[in-house]
């Protein structure tokens, strides 16, 4: 089953929750990165958060190039989860704790995401572990949310280790179990690597990157 209907509904509920509770759109620190998601004026040198809303992409993003580069078919949900929208990360509450779903802020962010997916999969191969790809983070500790590439199930994964706890049999069921979390925007730290300057993806997986690529 495609994860897109569940993602569509969560995005709708997400923005409605902010409008109902706060009377405004969610806010986000773009850190100088433009995006079609931005509502209102945008100044690249501003350090203030902006209002945003998701925008469906004119051309759906694809990971076919990643599949070819690694000679590895990816579970189809990756194209839908990351390729349909431009969006800021999505905060959530769940029975597993609070966390966030990663999304893509702009075209450059998508390219950086692809690079990081490749790096993650190469590290899994190096460690002789089954392939996975990430969809987000839990706020507690260094817990990534990853997809088992063989069957599409959702798991908790600690960087450098195999998946440890299955949360859902599918990405659809996992998203359907989440509730939007209303919270003020948080300004993420800039990382000291040029490839990580894009806030939509890399500033939100700081711990994962440091664990994966600090142990090469």
Curated annotation (Swiss-Prot):
Keyword NADP among record annotations: no
Pfam families: Syd
Highest taxon in the source lineage: Bacteria
Record keywords: Cell inner membrane, Cell membrane, Membrane
Subcellular compartments: Cell inner membrane
Membrane topology, record value: Peripheral membrane protein
Cited CDD domains: Syd
UniProt similarity note: Belongs to the Syd family.
Name the UniProt record assigns to this protein: Protein Syd
